[in-house]
């Protein structure tokens, strides 16, 4: 294909589920490639398998792509001259092309039943052979075909794969790739109901939409020789193909949608309060890397840098720890108001703040979130991070290490003195709390960890956390005094 041809790429999902991290990566790399080359990014919906399509599947794809920060030049919602952009609306385009292959003797009608095909495959497996269609309907006469149809058999249409050919293409990721035609077998291009199969519809659509490059996961690489054969049959020039390595989990196994231990759908990350810019950044580095060690880039920087030559030949590791780190880098840069907006729905969902906040409660939420602004990785994390602010004094328990600290003989004296200091304060602000702790130090003679750690553990229930005076201010006078009093009564 001529290198000067306008770059036109597509993301072509099936509306059979929600936007998966792997599909999002395919869309993102195509988007970056198009924008880097001032080309066109097209969304095409491959919805011919009606039984597998789900309600809202198409909407989920589009909504979440937009949320991630992608836009497109043509698609079901952006009309263009190459439409329709749903395969289910292109049947009138496919039918004459299928008939053309039949008329030219490049395809034929197959009357085999599923039972016959299953039996054929099982026999081949038992003989240690690669399962592929035997071609037994390939040489049926017109009379034999008519007899089959008179008996009520509906044919599928199979492509005649030429014998003894090597199908070779230069892949953007894998370099030269070859397949032997003898290992493919005549494949179905139209089902018994006349609906074209994936490989036929994709090849036709990519040609008619003038797709210049096909960048997709390498689970599609076995489809490529079939699509090239279809291109050749029509005398069309194939696009340039690129097959990205798959995404694997920490066990180096292919990321499976059935693995519930890993969050894999974009909608789930949205619901947890991840930032679209951070997910964009993380996904863009799944199997692609720029020069240098930097890992945080804007969308504009990714567009400027993107080069498919830097796509990895090794599987991309999905590292959830890395994702939360990336998201934290973005959260830290947000203004506090934005972090509050990110956190508030999760606090409300947990029932720890009101559904309708007055100004005083909203101000308090700002103080709470400010304690965790630097630490927070995503919106929903505010709930477990801040749970000690909502616990009742009676429900606070101490682990072995905390219990050991509180067993020191000076602790009751420190806690009593601190309680007395707080009771004398009219306003519980961080500066006043800090001064009160200093007075306790002077009064008791206890300092350092022996002073701060018992106060922290009794008031917050934790050995580590936000700066202690600030945490006590946010906890509030009543709650802190209640916790101090409860501990003293029980000890």
Swiss-Prot record:
Subcellular locations according to the entry: Cytoplasm
GO cellular component: cytosol
Cofactor note: Binds 1 zinc ion per subunit.
Superkingdom, taxonomy of origin: Bacteria
Annotated catalysed reactions: tRNA(Glu) + L-glutamate + ATP = L-glutamyl-tRNA(Glu) + AMP + diphosphate
Motif ('HIGH' region) on chain: 13-23
One biological process term in Gene Ontology: glutamyl-tRNA aminoacylation
Keywords: Aminoacyl-tRNA synthetase, ATP-binding, Cytoplasm, Ligase, Metal-binding, Nucleotide-binding, Protein biosynthesis, Zinc
GO MF annotations in UniProt: ATP binding; glutamate-tRNA ligase activity; tRNA binding; zinc ion binding
Pfam family of the protein (one): Anticodon_2
Positions bound to Zn(2+): 110, 112, 137, 139
NCBIfam families according to UniProt: gltX_bact (TIGR00464)
Record-stated family: Belongs to the class-I aminoacyl-tRNA synthetase family. Glutamate--tRNA ligase type 1 subfamily.
Quaternary organization: Monomer.
Name of the protein: Glutamate--tRNA ligase
Organism encoding this protein: Listeria monocytogenes serotype 4b (strain F2365)
Lineage: Bacteria, Bacillati, Bacillota, Bacilli, Bacillales
């Amino acid at each position: 294909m001529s290198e000067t041809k306008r770059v036109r790429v597509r993301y072509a999902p099936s509306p059979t589920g929600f936007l998966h991290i792997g599909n999002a990566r395919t869309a993102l790399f195509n988007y970056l490639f198009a924008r880097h080359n001032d080309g066109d990014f097209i969304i095409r919906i491959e919805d011919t398998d009606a039984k597998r399509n789900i309600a809202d599947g198409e909407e989920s794809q589009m909504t979440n792509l937009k949320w991630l920060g992608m836009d497109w030049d043509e698609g079901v919602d952006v009309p263009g001259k190459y439409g329709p952009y749903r395969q289910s609306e292109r049947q009138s385009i496919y039918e004459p092309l299928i008939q053309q292959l039949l008329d030219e003797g490049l395809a034929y009608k197959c009357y085999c039943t599923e039972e016959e095909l299953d039996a054929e495959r099982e026999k081949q497996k038992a003989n240690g052979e690669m399962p592929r269609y035997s071609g037994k309907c390939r040489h049926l006469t017109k009379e034999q075909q008519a007899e089959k149809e008179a008996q009520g058999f509906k044919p599928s249409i199979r492509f005649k794969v030429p014998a003894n050919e090597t199908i070779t293409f230069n892949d953007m990721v894998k370099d030269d790739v070859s397949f032997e035609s003898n290992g493919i077998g005549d494949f179905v291009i139209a089902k018994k109901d006349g609906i074209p199969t994936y490989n036929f519809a994709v090849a036709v659509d990519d040609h008619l939409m003038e797709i210049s490059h096909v960048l997709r996961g390498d689970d599609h690489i076995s489809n490529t020789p079939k699509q090239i054969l279809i291109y050749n049959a029509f005398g069309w020039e194939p696009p340039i193909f690129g097959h990205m390595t798959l995404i694997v989990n920490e066990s180096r196994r292919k990321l499976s949608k059935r693995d519930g231990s890993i969050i894999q759908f974009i909608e789930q990350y949205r619901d947890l309060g991840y930032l679209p810019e951070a997910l964009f950044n993380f996904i863009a580095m799944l199997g692609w890397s720029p020069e240098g060690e930097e890992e945080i880039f804007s969308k504009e920087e990714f567009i400027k840098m993107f080069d498919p030559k830097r796509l990895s030949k090794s599987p991309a590791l999905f590292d959830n720890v890395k994702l939360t780190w990336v998201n934290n880098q973005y959260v830290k840069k947000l203004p506090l108001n934005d972090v509050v907006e990110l956190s508030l729905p999760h606090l409300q969902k947990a029932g720890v703040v009101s559904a309708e906040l007055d100004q005083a409660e909203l101000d308090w939420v700002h103080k709470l979130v400010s304690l965790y602004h630097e630490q927070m990785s995503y919106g929903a994390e505010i709930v477990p991070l801040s749970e000690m602010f909502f616990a009742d004094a009676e429900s606070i328990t101490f682990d072995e290490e905390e219990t050991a600290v509180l067993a020191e003989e000076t602790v009751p004296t420190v806690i009593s003195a601190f309680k007395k200091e707080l009771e004398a304060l009219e306003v519980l602000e961080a500066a006043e709390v800090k001064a009160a702790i200093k007075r306790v130090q002077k009064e008791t003679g206890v300092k350092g960890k022996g002073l701060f750690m018992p106060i922290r553990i009794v008031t917050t229930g934790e050995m580590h956390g936000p700066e202690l005076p600030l945490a006590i201010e946010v906890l509030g006078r009543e709650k802190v005094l209640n916790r101090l009093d409860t501990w003293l009564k029980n000890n």
